[in-house]
Regions:
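Mid-to-C-terminal alpha-helical segments outside catalytic/metal-binding sites
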Residues: 59-127
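Active-site-adjacent C-terminal substructures of enzyme catalytic domains
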Residues: 1-70
Length: 127
């Protein structure tokens, strides 16, 4: 068990994971993003603290997941929730660019999700 990738509820089987990924990629209007980034200091992770610190890498990871289907990514991340819950459209934008980078191994005292992994997309800063 990789304590840095442990969260609840767990996806028990590869078929469960595949079904969730298929649902997300389906573009269904009732399927939308929800983040529960849970940073726990390294010392607590080895005591069974569930939760993954995904904030630094979740958007680049989703860009790789949706590569070639950016419209479905936009719907999953934003449009579906706006439409389903009658939310106002934010006047801020996030730009994701194709640029290789390596996820940090540590952020303060926390190991982020996929620490040390190379990604092909990153969030453009300074907008």
């Amino acid at each position: 068990l990789n304590v840095h990738m442990f969260c609840k509820p767990t996806v028990k089987l590869a078929t469960d994971r595949d079904a969730l990924q298929e649902l997300v990629k389906s573009g269904h209007k009732n399927v939308m993003f929800g983040s529960d980034s849970a940073p726990h200091p390294l010392k607590n992770k080895f005591k069974g603290a569930a939760g993954i610190f995904s904030a630094p890498i979740i958007l680049p990871a989703l860009a790789e997941f949706f590569v070639g289907d950016e419209l479905k990514m936009q719907k999953f991340l934003s449009d579906n929730a706006i439409n389903n819950f009658g939310l106002e459209v934010a006047d801020r934008k996030i730009e994701i660019v194709e640029e290789e980078w390596i996820a940090p191994r540590m952020v303060g005292e926390v190991v982020p999700m996929w620490a040390g992994k190379t990604f092909n997309y990153k969030v453009k800063t300074g907008l």
